[in-house]
A protein has these predicted regions:
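Rossmann-fold NAD(P) dinucleotide-binding segment
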Residues: 203-219
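Short helix-loop-beta connector
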Residues: 123-130, 152, 215-216
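NAD(P)-binding Rossmann-fold cofactor-contacting core
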Residues: 150-173
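Short acidic low-complexity segments
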Residues: 178-193, 208-209
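N-terminal ligand-binding/catalytic initiation module
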Residues: 1-109, 117, 124-127, 296, ...
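Short, well-ordered coil/turn residues at beta-beta hairpins
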Residues: 197-200, 222-223, 246, 302
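Glycine-rich Rossmann-fold phosphate-binding loop(s) that bind the pyrophosphate
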Residues: 136-137
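Rossmann-fold NAD(P)-binding glycine/threonine-rich loop
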Residues: 214, 222-278
């Protein structure tokens, strides 16, 4: 079995180059969304606690099965820990044998940003140049980098309640090639924004954006509302928007649309990417992607990592680990402890 550690991923991305790596993730994810009907899909299994949530996110096609373990603990940073950490496993369906264990903390941030970019391809105006981001925590830089893959951005305004988070974001974005504008309020941040990303972490019902703060024809990508009782946008804004989600069954439970019915949803994202339904239809309509994160996205990126693990030039970034016993007699599992003959551990 192979292992992709955080150090292995860092070295893999350095070898490929961040732009090329982001491009590969986008291409792979779009291709998997388009073959939506080939996947066995289910909403994530969430266990909620007063201080956070722990989730399992499975997805499979006819060849591979994946699942991700992921948490969400907004107060972790007060204790020097990440709010979100994740691990993933990819297995072959035919035997059920796991093939890869992968870090998924960084890959989750990357695939989440890739969804933002894919939605922007269909929902943002093609001439969008100014991006605004509300919330400059761990996800923010990935979001901007991915959107730059699909839109020719020129400027970026940003706001967070935490000045240190804005300092961190500004330092990381210094080499982005964008004109940066640090703002003192959400309203100020949205001035002249062609596209808006909301990426806040507080688990509560919010109403962050007023309709009259938005430029006509703006596109909003809301990713902070991702569990029951946690939303970022008010009813007036939702009802004025063309809404696209990843997976209706999950979004109606967890997303911004959790207090609306199914008729409020224009489409699932795969339907836009596959050309089944239109995305943006005018320069003035308000569009909204209500993104909560879906397991197909994890399948896509961990399968891409598995592909890299067998390619010359990249396989060295993956470790071989002995996690499964190989038996001379597969019915004699106990023999692993009692005999050294014909008994090995399988990497």
């Amino acid at each position: 079995m192979k292992l992709l550690s955080v150090d292995g991923l860092r070295n893999l991305v350095a070898s490929l180059g961040q732009t090329a790596f982001y491009g590969a993730v986008l291409e792979t994810l779009e291709r998997d969304f388009i073959r939506w009907g080939e996947f066995i899909k289910t909403p994530r299994l969430a266990t909620h606690y007063p201080f956070g949530v722990i989730e399992l996110m499975p997805c499979a096609d006819r060849q591979f099965y994946t699942f991700k373990y992921v948490n969400g603990h907004p107060q972790n940073t007060q204790h020097g820990k990440l709010c979100v950490v994740a691990l993933g496993i990819l297995a072959e369906v035919e035997s059920g044998y796991p093939l890869l264990i992968s870090e998924m903390t960084l890959l989750t941030a990357i695939r989440t940003a890739a969804v933002t970019a894919l939605a922007a391809k269909s929902l943002a105006r093609p001439d969008s140049r100014h991006l605004a981001i509300i919330g400059t925590g761990a996800q923010a830089e990935f979001q901007v980098g991915m959107v730059q893959q699909v839109l020719a951005l020129e400027s970026l305004s940003y706001f967070d309640l935490d000045p240190k988070a804005m300092d961190k974001f500004a330092a990381n974005m210094a080499a982005s090639g964008l004109q940066l504008r640090r703002c003192r309020s959400i309203e100020e941040t949205l001035k002249e924004a062609d596209m808006v990303i909301t990426a806040t972490a507080a688990k509560r019902v919010n109403d962050l954006i007023q309709l009259d703060w938005l430029k006509p024809g703006a596109h909003i990508h809301a990713m902070g509302g991702d569990c029951p009782g946690k939303t970022e946008l008010g009813q007036a804004l939702l009802k004025a928007s063309k809404i696209v989600v990843e997976y209706r069954q999950q979004s109606l439970l967890e997303g911004e649309v959790q207090n609306l019915d199914d008729s409020a949803v224009h489409a699932e994202l795969w339907q836009l990417l596959a050309g089944q339904l239109p995305g943006r239809e005018s320069d003035t309509e308000l569009t909204l992607c209500d993104a909560v994160g879906f397991a197909l996205e994890d399948f896509s990126i961990i399968k891409l990592m598995h592909d890299y693990s067998s390619q010359d030039g990249y396989r060295q970034y993956f470790d071989e680990i002995a996690m499964l016993p190989t038996m001379a007699d597969p019915k004699d599992l106990y023999g692993f402890f009692t005999s050294a003959t014909g008994v090995t551990s399988q990497p």
